[in-house]
């Protein structure tokens, strides 16, 4: 009699195929999210790289200079505003032989791989939210309505980029999920979902509005997409391999490494993920953090 489990889809009998599937899906998801956010391609950095955000300003002198006179220097000021380390994050999960026996490999392995992948994606965005809200150089203000808060958040970062003589080609706005739905309840707008991330396109001047429960209620954050950079460490770095750690990577941009193996001592299927990714804002003072408070 044929084992009915053999007919189930997505059962990887080859560990290498499962590893490649995992890293390919992760990379494809991030590529799609990058396009939604409108940010440029990821930039590879060496392990231990220091990430720095700046504030920048120029005090322009008069350009009407008499013939033969010394041209006065315009004062340019660049100040380091925030620092961070681009570090390696290490994750592991295990599926027991009992779970495979109870549910079958298609559920016990594949479903937990899916959940593992989603959590790894979310941790990068969550860290970015923390970075944005902890920024003491950000533009801050308070408005009485959600609509005004969104509009002014966008306006303030566009104005900042204009005064920096930079082009804010598009702006992404981050808002609390319930705040957005409360406002959107009366509006005919389509909320789209990409790998568990809810967003609205072309809303009130924002090219993309990200809805997240990680953003505090009453808080609106706006960032020009030209101010967002995704840095990463290549998990396939040859120096890691010298430790005997060989992670599967896939594609031109190796954002994550994945390795799966069986552990006979505990009778589990162990999976290991290695990544070093950080979304970063280059100019700390080109971020707007708006508080919505309708208290009279």
Region annotations inferred by a language model:
Residues 136-207:
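Extended, solvent-exposed, turn-rich assembly/linker loops in the middle of proteins
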Residues 2-9, 43-50, 189-296:
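Sequence/fold signature of self-assembling virion shell proteins
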Residues 18-90:
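Assembly/oligomerization interface modules of large self-assembling protein complexes
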Residues 89-91, 169, 265-267:
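Residues at beta-strand starts and edge strands
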Residues 89-99, 173-179, 205, 211-213, ...:
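Helix N-cap / beta->alpha transition motif
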Residues 1-24, 28, 294-296:
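Short, intrinsically disordered N-terminal pre-domain segments
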Residues 92, 96-166, 289-296:
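Alpha-helical scaffold segments that mediate packing/assembly in large oligomeric complexes
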Residues 7, 22-29, 43, 47, ...:
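Generic hydrophobic, helix-prone segments enriched in Leu/Val/Ile
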């Amino acid at each position: 009699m044929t084992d009915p489990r053999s007919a189930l889809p997505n059962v990887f009998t080859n560990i290498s195929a499962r590893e490649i599937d995992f890293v390919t899906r992760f990379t494809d998801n991030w590529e799609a999210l990058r396009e939604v956010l409108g940010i440029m391609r990821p930039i590879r950095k060496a392990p231990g790289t220091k990430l720095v955000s700046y504030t920048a300003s120029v005090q322009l002198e008069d350009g009407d200079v008499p013939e033969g006179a010394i041209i006065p220097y315009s004062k340019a000021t660049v100040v380091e505003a925030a620092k961070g380390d681009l570090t390696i994050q290490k994750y592991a999960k295990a599926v027991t032989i009992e779970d495979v026996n109870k549910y079958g490999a298609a559920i016990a392995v594949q479903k937990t791989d899916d959940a593992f992948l989603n959590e790894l994606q979310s941790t990068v965005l969550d860290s970015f939210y923390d970075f944005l809200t902890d920024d003491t150089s950000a533009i801050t203000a308070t408005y009485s309505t959600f609509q005004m808060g969104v509009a002014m958040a966008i306006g303030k970062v566009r104005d900042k980029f204009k005064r920096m003589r930079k082009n804010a080609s598009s702006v992404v706005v981050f808002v609390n999920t319930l705040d957005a739905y409360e406002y959107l309840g009366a509006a005919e707008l389509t909320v789209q979902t990409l790998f568990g991330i809810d967003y609205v396109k072309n809303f009130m001047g924002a090219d993309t509005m990200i809805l997240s429960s990680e953003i505090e209620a009453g808080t609106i954050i706006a960032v020009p997409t030209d101010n967002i950079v995704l840095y990463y460490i290549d998990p396939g770095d040859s120096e890691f391999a010298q430790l005997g750690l060989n992670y599967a990577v896939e594609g031109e941009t190796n954002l994550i490494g994945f390795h799966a193996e069986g552990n006979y001592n505990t009778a589990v299927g162990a999976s290991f993920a290695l990544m070093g990714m950080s979304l970063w804002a280059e100019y700390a003072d080109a971020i707007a953090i708006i508080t919505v408070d309708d208290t009279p």
